[in-house]
């Protein structure tokens, strides 16, 4: 019954006959309930729709949006394919209808870019747009998606890789690989959020690993997390004002229960409030 609700819930992209559609989803009503529950508690839910990388699941179902045209080969959308933008814009329209947040997160991190280098369509896009590198090709996509979001009254957030190839005019940068991405962003006049992994990733081991549940790796003690200063001394007063805050990240693939998740995020998450 729940799966039928998902199929018939007004989603733009849903392969109803795909036997791999086995669950792990929210219906539109589920999302509206979460957004409303959060809003009652003065919390804004900001959705993240990953692009161009981290898209293996989408490309397994829609392989025509990849450079190879085959499932389970690429993790990045084909930026040379105009259907990629048609797909993503339709997804974002649906997302914006469900989430009233001022910001929409588009990911932008960890794209391998390997498929683009030998893709005829990506090569043509680079030639037509006078792009000198695959980094600039990714930036072309981010610029284009930013304009689409801005035209619909929203603002773009992306991980610090969106700086590579040229930062877009209004993007907010989430600096996860260190502090340098945020510094670069604010010096360019863009807003930034500090979330460097060595201080802000709450899925790391927080004590001796042999005394803790299995984690993805890393090591973040309470003392180290508290030592983080999110506004570098090198910034001017005006630049410092563009640091909008700190974000603590928790990825739950090693956390099978809500209780385990709470164990990992408290008290570390209180540092980031």
Please give the residue ranges for each predicted region.
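Anion (oxyanion) recognition and catalysis
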Residues: 32, 39, 150, 186-187
